[in-house]
Amino acid sequence: MKPLMLQGHQRAITQIKYNREGDLIFSSAKDSKPSVWYSLNGERLGTFNGHIGAVWCVDVDWTTTRLITGAGDMNTFLWDVETGTALGKIPCNSSVRTCNFSFSGNQASYSTDRAMNHPCELFVIDVRNIDASISSADPVLKLTMNEQQSKITSMLWGALDETVITGHENGSLRIWDLRAVKELNSVNDHTASITDMQMSSDGTMFVSSSKDCSAKLFDSDSLMCLKTFKTERPVNSACISPLFEHVALGGGQDAMEVTTTSTQAGKFDSRFFHLVYEEEFARVKGHFGPINSMAFHPDGKSFATGGEDGFVRLQVFDSSYYEHTFE
C-alpha cells in the first residue's frame, strides 16, 4: 500500500474533498491557496489565487464546475473550476468556518465565526448566476446563532435541500428547516466540539467526529445516534466508505500539543472501524502530525488524508482489504 504524497501546500491542510467522479481532489490549507489535484497520479492541476488568509473550508458542486471556499480573511469566494478564475467574492463580518454546495448546486451555504462583537451566522445564497454583484446581493436566508447554540464548526445539507445540519463548538448537532426558517431538532450526544461531519453516499446517515475522542453515526433525518466509535485521542475527521460497511477516523492530539512525538507512537494513524460492530480492524501510518481531514474516494477503493504537516496522502487499498472478513 504505497501512498502518493501530494506536496504543494506550505502550511497545514484544513480540508480535502473529492469531486463526484473522484478524478479530482480539492484541498484547502492555512497558506491561502486552495489547490486541485489529479487523484490518479497526484499531479497538481493548479491553485485558486485570491484569498489572503488561512482557508478553512472548500467544497465543489455536483458537476465539478464551481468551487466555494471560505477563509480567515473574512471572505467567501466562488470559483470556476476549469479556469481557476474567481466568479464572485462575498465579504463577511468574521472569518468563514464552513461552506457547502447543496445537492442541486443551485444554492450554497456558509457560516461565520463569533468574533469582534459579531454573532455566529449561517447564510444560504443562490449561486445559479454568479457575477460581481453577488458581493452586495442579499442572502436567500440568514440564521443567527445565540449564546446557547454556540458557534458552528461544521455543516451539511440534508435531504432534498430542505434542511441544513450543523455541528457546534459545544458538541450539539442541530437540524434547520430552511423553508420555515426554524430549528427542527437538536441533540447533545457529543460532549466536546464537533470537528467534522460527512454524509454517507446515499445520504441516509452521516458520521460526526469530535474532540471528545469519539466519532458517532447519526440518522440524517431524526438525528438519532446509531453507533459510536471510541478512540483515546481527539478525532479531527471521519468518513464512511461508499463500498463497505467501514468508517475511517483520523486525528491525533491538538496541533498545539504536538511537540516531539514520533510517528511510530501511533498517534497519527488513520483508523478503520466496522460500521456495524464498532470494532477497529486496521490502522494506516503516515503523517508527521495530526490528520485534519479525511475522505474516501467515491468508488471506495482508495482514500485521502490531509495533515497538519501540509501533505495530502493518497492511499490505494491493496487486495487484502477486500478479502478481510469479520469473524
From Swiss-Prot:
GO cellular component, one term: eukaryotic translation initiation factor 3 complex, eIF3m
Keyword Protein biosynthesis attached: yes
The entry's keywords: Cytoplasm, Initiation factor, Protein biosynthesis, Repeat, WD repeat
First-listed, main subcellular location of the protein, grouped into a coarse class: cytoplasm
Gene Ontology molecular functions: RNA binding; translation initiation factor activity
Location in or out of the cell: Cytoplasm
GO biological process: cytoplasmic translational initiation; formation of cytoplasmic translation initiation complex
Keyword Disulfide bond carried by entry: no
Signal peptide: none
InterPro entries: eIF3i, WD40/YVTN_repeat-like_dom_sf, WD40_repeat_CS, WD40_repeat_dom_sf, WD40_rpt
Ranges of the WD repeats in the UniProt entry: 8-47, 50-89, 147-186, 189-228, 286-327
Pfam families, per the entry: EIF3I
The organism's place on the tree of life at top rank: Eukaryota
PANTHER family: EUKARYOTIC TRANSLATION INITIATION FACTOR 3 SUBUNIT I (PTHR19877:SF1)
Quaternary assembly: Component of the eukaryotic translation initiation factor 3 (eIF-3) complex.
Stated family: Belongs to the eIF-3 subunit I family.
Known function: Component of the eukaryotic translation initiation factor 3 (eIF-3) complex, which is involved in protein synthesis of a specialized repertoire of mRNAs and, together with other initiation factors, stimulates binding of mRNA and methionyl-tRNAi to the 40S ribosome. The eIF-3 complex specifically targets and initiates translation of a subset of mRNAs involved in cell proliferation.
Protein name (database record): Eukaryotic translation initiation factor 3 subunit I
